[in-house]
Amino acid sequence: MSSTLGKDKDSKEREPKAEGKSKTKGKDAKDGKKDTSGASPAVAFTLDSTIKRPNPPPSTRKKSSNAEVIKELNKCREENSMRLDLSKRSIHLLPSSIKELTQLTELYLYSNKLQSLPPEVGCLSGLVTLALSENSLTSLPDSLDNLKKLRMLDLRHNKLREIPAVVYRVSSLTTLYLRFNRITTVEKDIKNLSKLTMLSIRENKIKQLPAEIGELCNLITLDVAHNQLEHLPKEIGNCTQITNLDLQHNDLLDLPETIGNLASINRLGLRYNRLSAIPRSLAKCRELEELNLENNNISVLPEGLLSSLVNLTSLTLARNCFQSYPVGGPSQFSTIYSLNMEHNRINKIPFGIFSRAKVLSKLNMKDNQLTSLPLDFGTWTSMVELNLATNQLTKIPEDICGLVSLEMLTLSNNLLKKLPYGIGNLRKLRELDLEENKLESLPNEIAYLKDLQKLVLTNNQLTTLPRGIGHLTNLTYLGLGENLLQHLPEEIGTLENLEDLYLNDNPNLHSLPFELALCSKLSIMSIENCPLSHLPPQIVAGGPSFIIQFLKMQGPYRAMV
């Protein structure tokens, strides 16, 4: 019986802030591809400033009648307000009297039901910000080209099948959001928007960019993620001011050599494409800090590429075809903070490859073909998160004791039969995952891991636990399911912070110690498929609180009831 009091978190994207004071919340578009990276995936970044956050509470704003909207317009005119926010009013039609608000510089119409705008909006000649996200717009009035001062136009989450022709004529624009529409093409007239510093056209159906994109010489951020691009025009190299370029989730087969002209770029997202090679010219992008090549068809990098990228701190090569580490020696990792090589075919970490990696804190080697670790393994003293899951490791070297900064260690799905005594030296360890190995016992030294909060030992061959387990008083999660445990030590009662305890599928576990009643914070206890004959079925059905109460009543702790 398992009683779960877990907390499911609904999440929603936070959309980027518009210029001025506006905020808008958008809807996340699922890409259908699961990211299973273990140790802190490096740089699945989103240049549209999108991050996952819990759903906000439902809006309490009442649906507006046309009369109420007109009242708002009148109030704005009387107060001579320069900012008008009519977001989330369920507006179907914007009154033509909007034309009277010529003093406006900011107009926010997020999350309404607009299918069109009245041409009178073109009378608002002082507008700097026009926010129209989350409506049902299919077009825009030609009168918008009267907005000679407009700098920010937000058209995210509408039903546009093309970029309205009038948009290309608003040459004052510096920020243009077109995310999550149904746009298939970008016209040559994009060159007219030469003042753009931010262009987001992610999550559309665009198959190619015109050569004229290269005339946007002021672009700093270009986000074309989640489209259908197979190639980039070589003219992209003319956009030399770009610092953020997001091309993830396209169908890119190659990159132009001119990519090396982007001397200011510091973030380059290329994950989930069809690249088989990276141009050598990328070595000239010396300001690059984050490079994400996850889920492509790359087997080698140009020799010396990483050594040339002297500011690179985050590198993701996960889900490619690498059979060995990139050629370039130890110097190529001297600035790297996070390295993700998950899901490749690497069978060896070269000796000394991290001898200059003094800031390397996160290494993910999950799902490779490692059978052993290098002899200098113990010198990785800066390592904080280490993921070696799903390999073929049969033992961990004793000099693991040198990894004194380690906080998260994942060794699940290997062939380990025992742990080294040196494990006890990892005093900062907070999470230790040993699921699905062949462990028959744990060393007593595990008692020294007093900061440990999560210990996963599921699916091993453990018959007992060391009594020192009771010293892990910060433990909140203990997974012991699918083992051969015959009993639990009474010291388990000292785990005063334990919240989740999994004991399921231990066929030799016939009883629970009365001391378990002292674990007052237990909210999840899984005991399925354990022959616990001393627990009445109705007690088991009641969940952790009933079981704890029963153990108190039956044992020496009844005075605590």
From Swiss-Prot:
- Alphabetical list of InterPro entries matching this protein: Leu-rich_rpt (IPR001611), Leu-rich_rpt_typical-subtyp (IPR003591), LRR_dom_sf (IPR032675), LRR_domain-containing (IPR050216), LRR_R13L4/SHOC2-like (IPR055414)
- Residues covered by region (Disordered): 1-67
Q: What Gene3D superfamilies would the database entry show?
A: Ribonuclease Inhibitor
Q: What is its main location?
A: cytoplasm
PROSITE patterns to which the protein is assigned, alphabetical: LRR (PS51450)
Write out the GO MF terms. Answer: protein phosphatase binding; volume-sensitive anion channel activity
Q: Where are the LRR repeats?
A: 80-101, 103-124, 126-148, 149-170, 172-193, 195-216, 218-239, 241-262, 264-286, 287-308, 311-332, 335-356, 359-379, 382-403, 405-427, 428-449, 451-473, 474-495, 497-519, 521-542
Q: Where is the composition biased (Basic and acidic residues)?
A: 1-36
Question: What's a single GO BP term from this record?
Answer: cyclic-GMP-AMP transmembrane import across plasma membrane
Name the UniProt key words of this record, in alphabetical order.
Cytoplasm, Leucine-rich repeat, Nucleus, Repeat
Top-rank taxon of the source lineage equals Eukaryota
Known function: Core component of the SHOC2-MRAS-PP1c (SMP) holophosphatase complex that regulates activation of the MAPK pathway. Acts as a scaffolding protein in the SMP complex. The SMP complex specifically dephosphorylates the inhibitory phosphorylation Raf kinases, stimulating their kinase activities. The SMP complex enhances the dephosphorylation activity and substrate specificity of PP1c.
PANTHER family in alphabetical order: PTHR48051, RAS SUPPRESSOR PROTEIN 1 (PTHR48051:SF1)
Name under which the protein is recorded: Leucine-rich repeat protein SHOC-2
Species per Swiss-Prot/TrEMBL record: Danio rerio (Zebrafish)
**Encoding gene per record:** shoc2
